[in-house]
Amino acid sequence: MATTTSLLGLSKPAASDAADITVLNTNFDLIDAFLKGTGIGTTAKSIDSLDNATAFGLYNSNVGAPTSSYHACLVLPYNANYIVQIAYHSSTNPTVLCMRRKQHTDGWQPWEYVNPPMAAGVEYRTTERCDGKSVYRKRIVYTTTDIGTADSVSSINIPHGIASFGELVSATAHMGTYALPIMDSNGYMTLVNAVNSANITLRTNGVWGNERTWTIDLKYTKA
């Protein structure tokens, strides 16, 4: 007696049944329709919102996406309550990278960058964690003119504009081709001294004349 599969409803003839090409072709059509409906084996399937993309497959939408542009999104469900989405921008712009989010019992979590493009002044939530908290990244670019006094320690406070700054994970900085800390030929030192809830503090016992542009990359958690 013939039976059917539980997922696609494919017909499974009994060993005693005669071969039937119609049954075989129907099974092929069911498999093809299933793969097409989930974007597997073809182009990503268009959907009204990525918020509704919960079945395994490859989908495409600009609603519920990381940005207003269309994204190809791979959906990996563990079960009905735990789902992971990995989204890629559908354009050829190489600066837009992969993002990821998950849904648990409390709904969809925010999109997180795997490798953020690090445009100046933009805050990025990333997939990195520190002490179980989400790690954010931000690049601050700041220009100064004629700072410091020789043989006297001076401080430069650079506002970072980060709301709810929590714990500093790391801070790296450079000025042109010089990475901080910088020690010049006279032995004068410039370094990132501290990062608090409002400012990045550089300290120097040298003189930086003319216009200088400082670039600071921060990793941090939220309070």
Predicted regions and their residues:
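Glycine-rich, low-complexity segments
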Residues: 26-58, 103-137, 141, 164
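Short, compact, well-ordered microdomains
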Residues: 97-107, 205-214
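Glycine-rich, flexible loop motifs
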Residues: 31-96, 169
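Beta-strand-rich, repetitive solenoid scaffolds
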Residues: 11-13, 23-27, 87-90, 98-103, ...
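Acidic surface patches and DE-rich sequence motifs
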Residues: 79, 89-91, 102-104, 129, ...
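Extracellular attachment/recognition segments
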Residues: 65-67, 75-78, 134, 140-223
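Surface-exposed, low-helix, low-complexity loop/repeat segments of extracellular attachment proteins
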Residues: 5, 10, 19, 56-64, ...
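Extracellular "spike/adhesin" assembly and maturation modules
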Residues: 1-36
